Amino acid sequence: MNQSPSLIEQGISQQHLKTLSCANVLTLAYQSLGVIYGDLSTSPLYVYKTTFSGKLSLHEDDEEIFGVFSFIFWTFTLIALFKYVFIVLSADDNGEGGTFALYSLLCRYAKLSILPNHQEMDEKLSTYATGSPGETRQSAAVKSFFEKHPKSQKCLLLFVLLGTCMAIGDSVLTPTISVLSAVSGVKLKIPNLHENYVVIIACIILVAIFSVQRYGTHRVAFIFAPISTAWLLSISSIGVYNTIKWNPRIVSALSPVYMYKFLRSTGVEGWVSLGGVVLSITGVETMFADLGHFSSLSIKVAFSFFVYPCLILAYMGEAAFLSKHHEDIQQSFYKAIPEPVFWPVFIVATFAAVVGSQAVISATFSIISQCCALDCFPRVKIIHTSSKIHGQIYIPEVNWMLMCLCLAVTIGLRDTNMMGHAYGLAVTSVMLVTTCLMTLVMTIVWKQRIITVLAFVVFFGSIELLYFSSCVYKVPEGGWIPILLSLTFMAVMYIWNYGTTKKHEFDVENKVSMDRIVSLGPSIGMVRVPGIGLVYSNLVTGVPAVFGHFVTNLPAFHKILVFVCVKSVQVPYVGEEERFVISRVGPKEYGMFRSVVRYGYRDVPREMYDFESRLVSAIVEFVETEPGLEEEEMSSVRRKKEECMEIMEAKEAGVAYILGHSYAKAKQSSSVLKKLAVNVVFAFMSTNCRGTDVVLNVPHTSLLEVGMVYYV
């Protein structure tokens, strides 16, 4: 079955997918296997190996193996199936999922906007709906807390960014551990192959994966679902074979009693080993994050009726094999494969690792794009890799950065056990962030009773804290990697957000007053030249300081002036009919307008987007529908037509883009830490990141930059 581009586009660009036919749901469910479940399905490659990598030993009674499988089964059932499939997938934001979707819901319902240019008119967007106005005592109390303590809003943002940074850490560790685990199976057939060659092969595959990203996944995505399907069917069939051949009694380990027996007999070592068990649910967060690419029902169908049983059978079969082959624990996955099908399964495993890596890389591009929309990451070039499928993007800087980090981890560690320890900490951290945000969503958005909310957070939170504590114990053995990565990204995000916020505050404090503009008269104190001048700023009201700086140094300006503010709003997408908000600046004879251009946090301006024509059309429509005096209706209509003609003639004369090239500097009275953050770190990022003109796709032939210094 081939993937249908029209269905994928529908899955990505439309939020109301509940009316899909049964055939369409099944088609989307099949497609999701190659996009969502690549990471989750490759976990059997390293779960048992990592779990038994410490001091946990095997005894003849097999109580440890039965206990570990019991933990895997119930963790998979409670966290992946009950929490994510049955509960978390319901917390969508207009069909979109992920950490930012939860945060967006909270911001809208609790009015926690951290965007400095938020306007009341944004709340009238069709996707901004906040449901019924009714409040419960709990939801009102939480909202009141955030209103009375503004710093708590910043803390919530930092908490969300923490989860985001850990997710980025996942994107470094997933390709590394998946590819290296898959390739290491070759040593079983070629025992004399040196470990260095295995690492080199893994590095070559990783370089190949990142090198083809610029071409877009849509060119090869049609084979992703068949690969994942073949992989899941292979490992589940082998699992059934091993269960029947080696130890059918493993079925009894489905009882939770074996978890208790395991912890009782192994003690501290058993608790420490749980950091390996949690790797069985790596990738469950992807189900929620990629919700906007498919439908909630299709993801639930794919997981509940195919992915879940296939993986449980695979883990069961490997446990049955291990119960009779204690000495093969460090190569249990490949040792459990029957000899006649070893090489076919090895090849499929390698391709499955590539598919799993591709899924998290694409998800990282989406995460970084959303961070940029919230002013929480330096400007990067975002490229659409498909003209048909919305949401498939490529970010060159992030791609090569991830490749370098993956290669560094692969070459530096060379040990999938240490990688597993690092991976576990990243996974449990993201899950805990989701649980905490879901608790707030259940209180503020869903308005659930306090007993329901407490039951959710206590039950799932305690399970995840158990695994988290186990992973924290292994920080010296590889767990430091995601901590280092997340702290680095957190510092970058926070400093960038701090710097841009301070620059906006400077803009607000130093904007040019309308009295000054009006005092200049109709000519605005200068020669008006043909054409349209687009003055970009972050202000939604007032005249930006960059304009005052410009008119002070240049005695000419365009006949039509448009102050353009491109901003993000706390919804995933903004419809084209709602994108432009046009208003006048000053009297009509001045020919000055303001255009607020709104994008959702998942919207990305396309390279071929005809911005000029759409903007001019929006201005003309505004002029035509602008209310006038009834007694002068005829003359008003004539003046409107004349003004529209002037605007169109100005467009034909040419459009110039005026952007401020700003330099932020800390005030002399600032602390040493602030000077370091602003004058050194923020300045370095501003200098080396993409320019505003690149991000906004401004044509270089029409660009005019005005230098300004911001003292923050």
UniProtKB/Swiss-Prot annotation:
Extracellular-facing ranges: 41-67, 176-189, 241-267, 322-340, 414-424, 471-474
Keywords recorded for this protein, A-Z: Cell membrane, Ion transport, Membrane, Potassium, Potassium transport, Transmembrane, Transmembrane helix, Transport
GO CC annotations on file: plasma membrane
Tissue expression notes: Detected in the whole mature plant but preferentially expressed in roots and stems, and in potassium-starved plants.
Subcellular localization: Cell membrane
Main location group: membrane
Keyword Transferase in record: no
Transmembrane helix among keywords: yes
Transmembrane annotation, as ranges: 20-40, 68-88, 155-175, 190-210, 220-240, 268-288, 301-321, 341-361, 393-413, 425-445, 450-470, 475-495
InterPro entries xrefs: K+_transporter, K_trans_C, K_trans_N
Cytoplasmic side of membrane: 1-19, 89-154, 211-219, 289-300, 362-392, 446-449, 496-712
Family per record: Belongs to the HAK/KUP transporter (TC 2.A.72.3) family.
Database matches in NCBIfam families: kup
Further facts: Low-affinity activity is strongly inhibited by barium or cesium.
Function summary: High-affinity potassium transporter that could play a major role in the uptake of potassium from the rhizosphere. May act as a low-affinity potassium transporter under high potassium concentrations. Could also transport rubidium.
Protein name (database record): Potassium transporter 1
Species in which this protein is naturally found: Arabidopsis thaliana (Mouse-ear cress)
